[in-house]
A protein has these predicted regions:
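C-terminal beta-strand-loop-alpha-helix "lid" module of Rossmann-like NAD(P)-dependent dehydrogenases
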Residues: 1-214
């Protein structure tokens, strides 16, 4: 039977662990609130930009043809897989990984290329012998516009050089703190949804090429 001293040490150890766990929970909650606030602040802007680009795709571009609007037979697909740098994130990275594997299916490296953001998707896909064209990591805690721009510039260059025929981003769509959904979204070429208003006229300053290629 444990002595009274052993019991006191055990109680103290459990109490200390509870305090540490509580502190970790408070830090995680604060970081989640900050991340959610940033996501909520940028979402209307991103949605509006997407809507404008889709409208532009059916407007009069004065004979200018942007590679962003060029639709062609899909022989090779670029997948951008976005996950975390570290673990302890529940199913955040594993759900994205599962969806990425489903999307790639039985494709050979001649039929796909992979760009990963985050160490977890990179390591997981590499361990499964998928060829990774380019990887980025070290910024999942504090992603910035510049980080996103570097990734997109690489994917765009592949698309413009006809090395890939479409670009699909696989990421986690944040709904609320309890619900996050792994999602695959085609971002190139730009597509016009059936419910969008077609044929709107836009004034381009200085010209369509400068606007669409910015």
């Amino acid at each position: 039977m444990a002595s009274a001293q052993d019991l006191r040490k055990r109680i103290k150890s459990v109490t200390n662990t509870q305090q540490i766990t509580k502190a970790m929970k408070m830090v995680a909650s604060a970081r989640l609130r900050r991340a959610q606030a940033k996501a909520d602040a940028t979402r209307p802007y991103a949605e509006k930009i997407g809507q404008i680009l889709r409208h532009i795709s059916t407007s009069d571009l004065r004979d200018y043809v942007s590679p962003l609007l060029e639709s062609r037979p899909v022989k090779r697909t670029c997948y951008i897989v976005i996950g975390a740098d570290k673990g302890l994130a529940g199913a955040y990275s594993s759900n994205v990984l599962k969806l990425a594997i489903e999307q790639i299916g039985q494709k050979t490296p001649d039929e796909y290329c992979l760009i990963t953001a985050g160490r977890k998707p990179k390591d997981s896909l590499k361990s499964r012998h998928y060829h990774i064209d380019q990887s980025y990591s070290g910024f999942s805690d504090k992603p910035s516009y510049e980080h996103a721009r570097h990734i997109m510039d690489h994917a765009l260059s592949l698309y413009e050089r006809h090395e890939v025929d479409e670009v699909i981003m696989i990421y986690t769509r944040f709904v609320n703190s309890m619900t996050q959904i792994a999602q695959a979204e085609c971002i190139l070429p730009l597509e016009q949804p059936d419910d969008e208003v077609k044929g709107e006229e836009y004034e381009f300053m200085p010209d369509p090429a400068s606007v669409l290629d910015a």
